[in-house]
C-alpha cells in the first residue's frame, strides 16, 4: 500500500486525505504577496546545514504564510460568529500552530521563519515560538528513570506539563511560563523560564507535537492546534543532514568547555563521523521510524524536502 501522505490511491482504491501540490504550482498561489525580509535576517534564521535563501522563501514560505493568514482570519471570524450565536462576548484566543519533524530535518528553521513572516501580517503582530525541548524531563530525572539514551522519545517529555501550558495559552491566561532548555548544557536550566503573554499566534515546535494522547489521557497537545505542519524528507537524506550538522557542531559549539558534548571536540574526523552515525542509528532513526513519522498523517500540511533541503512539493489536507 503506498504511503498515505503521497496523494496517490491506495491498493483499496481509497484516496489520500491530502492534495499534493508541485512546488511550481504552490509558488504561483500567492503572486501578489510581499513580506519584507532581508538576507541578513535569513542568515540569523537559518539552521546549521539549512540552505534557506530568498528564492525558497518566495516560492514556499510566502504562500504558506498567506495560507496561514487566511486560516487565522477565518478562525477569528468563526469564533466571533459562534460567540454571537451563543449570545456571548467574543474573547480573543491565540491561533496555535504545531511544527513537527525529525531531528536535523529543518523544522526549527521553518518555525523561526514562520514566526518572523506571520508577525509581518497586520492582524498577527504578536507571534511567539516555544519549543518542546523545555518540556523534556531534566537530565537527573531521565537518569533516574533510565531514559537518557531515549532523550527525545515521547516518554522523555513531561507531556502533562506541555498540555497544561498550551491549554492555558489557548484559554487566554494573561501570562504563561514554560521551562527553559539550554542546548549548550543539554538540560533544563533551573529557575529560567520562557514567558508567553497572550500572543496572536503561538508556534509549538518539536519532534513529537503531533503524537496522539498518552495512554489514559483524554486530550493530546495536537488537539489544541488550529494548524499543524510536518517537515518531511527521505530517511537517508535526514541521516546525511544529521551527520553534517554533528560535524559542524563538533568544529564549533562542542569546542566550548561548557558544552555537554565537549568530549567530542577532540575526535578525529573519522571518529566524529562514526559517532554521528552511531547516535543516528541508535537513537534518532528509531525515534523517527517508531514515533515521529507515524504522526505525519495527522498534520494539516506536509512540506516534503529533496536532498538539497529545498521543498519539492506540498501536501495540504483537504477541507
UniProtKB/Swiss-Prot annotation:
EC number: 2.7.1.33
Gene Ontology CC terms, in alphabetical order: cytoplasm
Main location: cytoplasm
Entry keyword set: ATP-binding, Coenzyme A biosynthesis, Cytoplasm, Kinase, Nucleotide-binding, Transferase
CDD domains named in the record: PanK
Pathway the protein acts in: Cofactor biosynthesis; coenzyme A biosynthesis; CoA from (R)-pantothenate: step 1/5
Subcellular compartments: Cytoplasm
Gene Ontology terms: biological process: coenzyme A biosynthetic process
Protein's UniProt name: Pantothenate kinase
Positions of ATP binding: 101-108
Catalyzed reactions per annotation: (R)-pantothenate + ATP = (R)-4'-phosphopantothenate + ADP + H(+)
One term of GO molecular function: ATP binding
Lineage top rank: taxon: Bacteria
Organism of derivation: Clavibacter michiganensis subsp. michiganensis (strain NCPPB 382)
Protein family membership: Belongs to the prokaryotic pantothenate kinase family.
Amino acid at each position: 500500500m503506498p504511503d498515505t501522505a503521497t496523494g496517490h490511491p491506495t491498493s483499496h482504491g481509497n484516496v489520500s486525505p491530502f492534495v499534493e501540490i508541485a512546488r511550481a504550482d504552490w509558488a504561483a498561489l500567492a503572486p501578489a504577496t510581499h513580506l519584507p525580509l532581508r538576507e541578513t535576517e535569513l542568515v540569523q534564521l537559518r539552521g546549521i546545514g539549512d540552505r534557506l535563501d530568498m528564492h525558497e522563501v518566495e516560492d514556499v514560505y510566502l504562500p504558506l504564510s498567506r495560507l496561514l493568514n487566511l486560516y487565522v482570519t477565518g478562525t477569528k471570524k468563526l469564533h466571533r460568529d459562534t460567540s454571537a450565536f451563543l449570545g456571548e462576548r467574543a474573547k480573543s484566543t491565540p491561533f496555535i500552530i504545531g511544527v513537527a519533524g525529525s531531528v536535523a530535518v529543518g523544522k526549527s528553521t521553518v518555525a523561526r521563519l514562520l514566526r518572523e513572516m506571520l508577525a509581518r501580517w497586520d492582524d498577527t503582530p504578536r507571534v511567539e515560538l516555544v519549543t518542546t525541548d523545555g518540556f523534556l524531563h531534566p537530565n537527573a530525572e531521565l537518569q533516574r528513570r533510565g531514559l537518557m539514551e531515549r532523550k527525545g522519545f515521547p516518554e522523555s517529555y513531561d507531556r502533562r506539563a506541555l498540555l497544561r501550558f498550551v491549554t492555558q495559552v489557548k484559554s487566554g491566561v494573561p501570562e504563561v511560563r514554560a521551562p527553559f532548555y539550554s542546548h549548550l548544557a543539554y538540560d533544563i536550566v533551573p529557575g529560567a523560564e520562557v514567558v508567553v503573554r497572550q500572543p496572536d499566534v503561538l508556534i509549538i515546535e518539536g519532534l513529537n507535537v503531533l503524537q496522539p494522547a498518552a495512554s489514559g489521557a483524554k486530550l493530546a497537545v495536537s488537539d489544541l492546534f488550529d494548524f499543524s505542519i510536518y517537515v518531511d524528507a527521505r530517511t537517508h537524506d535526514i541521516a546525511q543532514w544529521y551527520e553534517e550538522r554533528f560535524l559542524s557542531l563538533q568544529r564549533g559549539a562542542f569546542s566550548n568547555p561548557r558544552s555537554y558534548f565537549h568530549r567530542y571536540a577532540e575526535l578525529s574526523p573519522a571518529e566524529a563521523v562514526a559517532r554521528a552515525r552511531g547516535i543516528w542509528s541508535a537513537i534518532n532513526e528509531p525515534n523517527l521510524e517508531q514515533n515521529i513519522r507515524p504522526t505525519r498523517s495527522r498534520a494539516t500540511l506536509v512540506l516534503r524536502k529533496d536532498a538539497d533541503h529545498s521543498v519539492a512539493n506540498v501536501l495540504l489536507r483537504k477541507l
